[in-house]
Design a protein with these regions (language model features):
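A conserved structural motif in NAD(P)-dependent oxidoreductases
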Residues: 75, 89-103
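Residue(s) in the substrate-gating loop at a strand-loop-helix junction
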Residues: 9
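Short, flexible catalytic-loop segment of classical short-chain dehydrogenase/reductase
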Residues: 30, 52-62, 66, 70-71
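Short C-terminal tail/terminal secondary-structure segment
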Residues: 14, 95, 106-109, 119-132
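Active-site loop immediately N-terminal to the catalytic Tyr-X3-Lys motif
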Residues: 14-21, 42-43, 95
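A short hydrophobic alpha-helix cap/turn motif
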Residues: 40-42, 55, 111
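Short, small/polar-rich loop/turn modules that mediate ligand/substrate recognition or access, typified
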Residues: 41, 46, 118-120
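Active-site helix of classical SDR
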Residues: 25, 33
């Protein structure tokens, strides 16, 4: 049995104003993953997605910087809101940002026999940002 995984980001389950193209692409990733799971399942191939929340990467920090410029709010205030330091709508329940290394274990689990009966599913790894 083979296992495949596609990144969907937690925003693949929500609608966020001013991010229409990004949100649309993430919704499409989940749809594609589900279709592939249906098509490849009869061959014993599993296809699942990992949907991470905010991960401390250059791209995420650039996004934060752009949000700051667009809204006139400080990066620190925005980050505090995102990571749940202030319980705002859409904030994470568990504080802090994911680190890139935090993503390895879920992918390894999906590729293991521990996930042999799982296909077409989105594994939310977002510190409670989206509870769907």
């Amino acid at each position: 049995t083979c296992a495949g995984a596609a990144a969907g980001r937690c925003w693949s389950r929500v609608a966020v104003p001013e991010f229409s193209a990004y949100i649309t692409s993430k919704h499409a990733n989940l749809g594609f993953m589900r279709v592939m799971a249906k098509e490849l399942g009869p061959r014993g191939i599993r296809v699942n997605a990992v949907c991470p929340g905010w991960v401390r990467t250059e791209a995420a920090m650039l996004s934060l910087q752009n949000m700051s410029k667009r809204t006139g709010r400080s990066e620190g205030d925005l980050l505090a809101e995102i990571v749940g330091a202030r319980l705002a709508h859409g904030a994470q329940v568990l504080p802090g940002l994911l680190e890139p290394d935090d993503l390895a274990a879920p992918y390894l689990w999906l590729a293991s026999d521990g996930a042999k009966d799982m296909t077409g599913q989105a594994l939310m790894l977002d510190r409670g940002e989206v509870m769907a």
